[in-house]
Amino acid sequence: MAQKVEAQGGIGGDVWDDGAHDGVRKVHVGQGLDGVSFINVVYENGSQEVVGGEHGKKSLIGIETFEVDADDYIVAVQVTYDKIFGYDSDIITSITFSTFKGKTSPPYGLDTENKFVLKEKNGGKLVGFHGRAGEILYALGAYFTTTTTPLTPAKKLPAVGGDEGTAWDDGAFDGVKKVYIGQAQDGISAVKFVYDKGAEDIVGDEHGNDTLLGFEEFQLDYPSEYITAVEGTYDKIFGFETEVINMLRFKTNKKTSPPFGIEAGTAFELKEEGCKIVGFHGKVSAVLHQFGVHILPVTN
């Protein structure tokens, strides 16, 4: 049963209530000249996205969006409010979101002196919003559920290889569905991954350069299959100041991929017992120089 935390702020406008859901995926916030003019929340119920009502009025300043990762949830909302000339009561002037994993949004709106925080005393999960709105947002409250088994934030294992190129980081997801590896004459030229997030396919960016050799694909039997380790090698290649990744091999709970690339140089393995790989990061130029992973504990 969700706990309804009373709305605070002013008494203007009309009451609105999105109710309680399983979680929050996105919050769209619109700013006016005097404060927060608009809010619209995308919730999740099971694997379905539910778009809440549009509360307040959009302005020419536009809309900003705070997105919550699939393995994270909002635990607190800091709200500022003030009495502004032209309004009969206090209005909401800014909103700042904080999550379980320590992610904090910028303040959306104009940060003023009067503050309150919407949260559950045991660090519960925010699952809905309610409040008052007219031409602007007057009051804001929330629904929380007590989380008896908090989500574990993903752990980032350091990348290995040579310190050259531009850093990239796909972040952490629910799992990995497909791996694409592009090979060059001297090493791995490019990588790209298809992830799962909330039962949706998320196609990651392509990191590196295409070659005439094209991409090779390694597909997992997701969700029953997951990557448990990545083996590889890196070596110093003529034409590059530091080492390049010249081979990658992916191990799952069911099988092992063929080696992609040429096995030579220093060997490495990226893994942690009892964990699955849910994201990748590294450094790249014309070839892949570094490769690292994000991991989460395996749960039944």
From Swiss-Prot:
Keywords: Acetylation, Developmental protein, Lectin, Repeat
Top-level taxon of the source organism: Eukaryota
GO-annotated molecular function: carbohydrate binding
A GO BP annotation: embryo development ending in seed dormancy
Domain Jacalin-type lectin as annotated: residue spans: 2-146, 154-297
Pfam families: Jacalin (PF01419)
Consequence of gene loss (knockout): Defects in female gametophyte development. Arrested during endosperm development.
Protein name: Jacalin-related lectin 32
Source organism of this protein record: Arabidopsis thaliana (Mouse-ear cress)
